[in-house]
């Protein structure tokens, strides 16, 4: 996973902040309610918190506004450089969902990142986080996902019809999950999980680790 989409991260690093603010019409709906999504993830997090795919630090800054103990994990050198320039005092680790070092955490969070993992890798990542989380610890993230395969294919067809070929290629290339698959991944690992939709693409997932 660490190198699978590294070229995408490298290409997007310099323009990511413009994209999330709606300047790219292809991704305008993907990032609708972006500020609200970030604020909600940050509010639901519990310190100490580990953020995966910290990128250019948009969620990271909100986490720091609310929590004392924040670790950012980011695989892209270009993204890490921007992040460190923005927040020089932040602990930043070169890593990703399947390769990181965290001795303790009460929550793991991410936004627009979990889809880089295959469904099998998503399960592996949840296993790794579950080993560290205490009872009542949480995994909180926002990402594109679909209620069914039919919904995913329909969204791709609509993107192509609008001439949003970059978005369509993105939806076909990466591993955007189905909600029933994610429900099974979390439930089978002892998490109580909820899904809340924020726009056509993005859902917020809050998974709490239950007792034995």
UniProtKB/Swiss-Prot annotation:
Enzyme class: transferase
One GO MF term attached to the UniProt entry: S-adenosylmethionine-dependent methyltransferase activity
UniProt-listed GO biological process terms: methylation
InterPro entries to which the protein is assigned, alphabetical: Methyltransf_25, SAM-dependent_MTases_sf, Uncharacterised_MeTfrase_YrrT
Family, per entry: Belongs to the methyltransferase superfamily. YrrT family.
Function: Could be a S-adenosyl-L-methionine-dependent methyltransferase.
Protein name: Uncharacterized methyltransferase Exig_2346
Organism: Exiguobacterium sibiricum (strain DSM 17290 / CCUG 55495 / CIP 109462 / JCM 13490 / 255-15)
């Amino acid at each position: 996973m660490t190198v699978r989409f590294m070229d995408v991260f490298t290409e997007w690093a310099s323009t990511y902040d413009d994209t999330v603010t709606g300047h790219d019409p292809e991704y305008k709906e993907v990032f609708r309610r972006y500020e609200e999504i970030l604020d909600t993830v940050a509010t639901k997090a519990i310190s100490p918190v580990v953020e995966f795919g910290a990128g250019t630090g948009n969620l990271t800054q909100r986490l720091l506004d609310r929590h004392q103990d924040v670790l950012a994990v980011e695989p892209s050198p270009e993204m890490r450089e921007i992040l460190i320039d923005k927040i020089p005092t932040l602990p930043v680790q070169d890593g990703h969902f399947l390769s990181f070092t965290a001795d303790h955490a009460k929550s793991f969070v991410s936004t627009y990142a979990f889809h880089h993992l295959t469904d099998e890798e998503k399960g592996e990542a949840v296993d790794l986080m579950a080993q560290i989380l205490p009872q009542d610890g949480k995994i909180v993230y926002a990402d594109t996902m679909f209620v069914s395969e039919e919904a995913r294919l329909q969204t791709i067809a609509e993107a192509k019809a609008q001439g949003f070929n970059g978005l369509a290629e993105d939806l076909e290339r990466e591993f955007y999950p189905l909600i029933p698959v994610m429900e099974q991944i979390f439930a089978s690992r002892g998490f109580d999980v909820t899904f809340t939709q924020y726009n056509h693409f993005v859902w917020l997932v809050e998974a709490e680790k239950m007792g034995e």
